[in-house]
């Protein structure tokens, strides 16, 4: 019972911090802002996280791990590259619709500014997983044998740009409405 209460409070802190980081920016969000949004004392907040940076790192890690696990499941579910990568894009689009703050934090935030260990979101586990999926598809002759990073950009460049447009409020329709056209453009650039 106590474990659940602790987890709920920690999740609440992370959720409120995510909202503030995406709305105000990391540097414009103070620990006091997070504490006020969570309706808890600063001391309570520090019982869960030792700094604002540790909250940011935990958020990134949680989002990264969820996306990585989803990609692993997609890879297991689909045996054909065409279906697999289309499902990846569908997942990214649906996740953006469900949790735009999470996707904004993952893709927009310049994590290296406050997480010096991180190189780039594009070297994180999910994107390394996608690169691995590309290399396997190339080995199997299912997609063009081009530089793997170029193939990843060909597959995800357009969809990620669509995600940015949706987050920025440029696209009125939900992202899944654009899935077929977006995926066909990506597929044409890598198909054999």
Residue ranges with predicted function:
Residues 83-86, 118-124, 139-156, 174-177, ...:
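All-alpha amphipathic helical-bundle segments outside canonical DNA-binding/catalytic cores
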Residues 94, 128-139, 157-158, 171-192:
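C-terminal peripheral helix-coil segments that are non-catalytic and often amphipathic
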Residues 91-115, 162-165:
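Amphipathic alpha-helical segments used for helix-helix packing
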Residues 58, 62, 72-98, 152-155:
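Hydrophobic alpha-helical connector segments
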Residues 65-68, 72, 115-140, 149-153, ...:
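Amphipathic alpha-helical packing segments from all-alpha helical-bundle domains
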């Amino acid at each position: 019972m106590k474990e659940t209460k602790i987890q709920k409070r920690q999740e609440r802190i992370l959720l409120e911090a995510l909202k503030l980081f995406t709305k105000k920016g990391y540097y414009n969000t103070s620990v006091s802002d997070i504490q006020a949004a969570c309706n808890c004392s600063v001391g309570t907040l520090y019982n869960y996280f030792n700094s604002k940076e540790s909250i940011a790192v935990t958020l990134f890690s949680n989002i990264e791990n969820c996306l990585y696990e989803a990609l692993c499941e997609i890879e297991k579910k689909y045996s054909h590259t065409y279906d697999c990568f289309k499902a990846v894009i569908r997942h990214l689009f649906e996740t953006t619709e469900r949790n735009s703050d999470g996707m904004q934090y993952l893709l927009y935030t310049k994590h290296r500014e406050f997480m010096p260990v991180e190189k780039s979101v594009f070297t994180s586990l999910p994107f390394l997983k996608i690169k691995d999926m590309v290399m396997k598809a190339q080995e199997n002759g299912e997609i063009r044998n081009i530089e793997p990073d170029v193939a990843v950009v060909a597959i995800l460049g357009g969809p990620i740009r669509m995600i940015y447009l949706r987050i920025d409020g440029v696209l009125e329709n939900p992202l899944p409405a654009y899935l077929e056209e977006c995926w066909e453009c990506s597929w044409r650039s890598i198909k054999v």
